[in-house]
Regions:
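Soluble extracytoplasmic domains of inner/organellar membrane proteins
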Residues: 84, 89, 99-223
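N-terminal positive-inside, membrane-proximal cytosolic segments immediately preceding the first
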Residues: 1-32
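Transmembrane signal-anchor/signal-peptide helices with a preference for the extracytoplasmic
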Residues: 2, 36-56
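Amphipathic alpha-helical repeat elements characteristic of tetratricopeptide repeat
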Residues: 9, 51-55, 71-74, 161
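Short extracytoplasmic
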Residues: 56-92
């Protein structure tokens, strides 16, 4: 297990101890009550146990991220990937770790975490991870890789952000005309997203973002 402090070790140990103490009893009761589907419930018990343990480690990771403890963040994220990759906590942990490591200047580790999250998370989580990964790659001047990370079409609601970041990468490459086109696309996508949501709250939230996109476009002499 990673090198956690005593309180964190206790949190994780408590999650494991519950299943060690009561797991057989719970599983046994289920099997007695549902003879013939014991295998299914046994698997469910295993999944529940994995989720409980992964949840405890994810809690340690988020606390470490808030404390900007890079070593502990890496250790917890690594344990989630190594032992609990089948749970939703592993990609969420990689996403949190990637952001924290990027903010701390560890671009190499951030890239590794976000790449994993972009390949193993849910659809929306993958899109968030791809956006963050592309931002890391842009900061690292890995422009072609950043554009590649943005290539697959994202889920609805992410299109404007993807187009904007594509524009940022193209601008960094000195491709002003292509960057202008990407920002124009981002504005168009944002308008479509606002129309689809049909909410005054959503429209208000999109206002400042629309202004930002327009400023980027104006800086390039676009309309």
């Amino acid at each position: 297990m990673a090198a956690y402090d005593l309180e964190e070790q206790e949190q994780i140990a408590n999650a494991k101890a519950f299943w060690q103490q009561y797991g057989n009893l719970i599983t046994g009761a289920v099997v007695v009550a549902a003879v013939g589907v014991g295998g299914y419930f046994g698997w469910q018990g295993y999944q529940n146990r994995q989720a409980a343990e992964a949840s405890a480690i994810y809690g340690v990771l988020t606390q470490a991220a808030e404390a900007k403890d890079s070593a502990k963040v890496k250790a917890a994220a690594g344990e989630l990937v190594e032992k609990y990759s089948g749970t939703g906590y592993a990609p969420m942990g990689a996403l949190v770790a990637g952001k924290m490591l990027f903010d701390s200047g560890d671009l190499k580790s951030a890239r590794a975490q976000l790449t994993w999250a972009s390949e193993h998370g849910s659809s929306e989580l993958r899109d968030v991870a791809r956006l963050r990964l592309a931002a890391v790659l842009l900061d690292d001047k890995a422009y072609d890789e950043a554009l590649k990370a943005l290539e697959p079409a994202p889920a609805e609601g992410f299109s404007a952000r993807f187009a904007e970041l594509k524009g940022d990468v193209l601008l960094a490459q000195g491709k002003s005309a292509e960057a202008r086109g990407a920002y124009q696309e981002a504005l168009a996508k944002l308008g479509a997203e606002k129309a689809g949501e049909g909410s005054s709250v959503a429209a208000q939230a999109a206002g400042p973002y629309k202004d930002l996109l327009q400023q980027k476009l104006d800086a390039l002499g676009g309309a």
